[in-house]
Amino acid sequence: MNRISSLALCLSLLWLGGCGTLPGTQSRSGIPARGEPFMRTSPAEVAASPTLRRLANEAALLQPLTQSDLTRRFLDATSSLPRIAPRTAYVYEMTREYYSPAARNALPEPRRSQLTETQLDEFRYYFTKYGSPLAYIRALEFASDQNFRDVAGKRILDFGYGSIGHLRLLASLGAQVTGVDPDSYLAALYTDSADTGTVPPAAGASRRSRGSITLVQGHWPKDTKVIEQVGRGYDLILSKNTLKRGYVKPERKVEDKRQLIDLRVSDQVFLTTIYNTLAPGGKLVIYNLHPRAATARERYKPMADGRSPFSREQFEKAGLQVVAFDAEDHAAVRKMGRLLKWDQNEKGETIDDLDNNLFALVTVVVRPAR
């Protein structure tokens, strides 16, 4: 969702790179034209792309942290990510609302003239505003612990997906993946027909099930149309840095409402929808990273309260079995953060103490098989 980036900004976990078209990407061979299906990337193309090269390096660094075949295959699949040509989008600076070229052209002329054109390059395609898609390995480890070891043929929903990178990795392993998010930035970025639909299998992946990506913009589960587009029968629902108590139920007054997330439905309706959206035996994994909480004298930071916004009793009342509730994953996420250099700036200088300013809490619930 569009408030997820606050965590990265607060922690100063700034990823390298930035906006702007990669030199030569407009005409470089190997990058498909708009609407053409993505093909498997060659080693030479990976070497030519700073973004894909970075992801490959991150995957190699993170491999020693993996504890399951699922996360190992997830990281291995980075070698099959396609090159991406820059995309044009338009932004209304007053509200930070983004528009695709088609959406911009549909606006009346007075509004069109108020928009600023911007180029979203390959780095933004995979990292968007929220950092490395490979940071999903910790959430996937907890899913694997619940006998979710092979995604081929499985249906996965990401609530507040924030980036297509991890969705494409899962789809390349054979999963039918749906991402739902109201953020206009994502809707303006992922407009090519090749961004969704069937995804070619990653090198070494099973070919018995072809994966796919579906992207849905809107407020789930408030909007009826969005509920219909998302559908039911999911084997896994992921929520990373979205369903935080600080975002959904802040303990102090927050003046800037953009820091919060309004689910637009009651807790009961939301959890009942989770139950109905999961297949029997399906899992929900809520994985939240957060910085140190503010003291009583400091300004309240909604992103720093990473607890589940729902109680154990609420989950159980909705018919869901609680496997883990606000379980700590601090040590593992700090190891990951150091490998991804979340504690360093672009010059390699240490700017944050992850031992005292990076934490992770995870909640896992299951819809009973019967």
Question: Where on the chain are the PLM-derived regions?
Answer:
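Conserved alpha-helix/loop element of class I SAM-dependent methyltransferases that forms part
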Residues: T128-G153
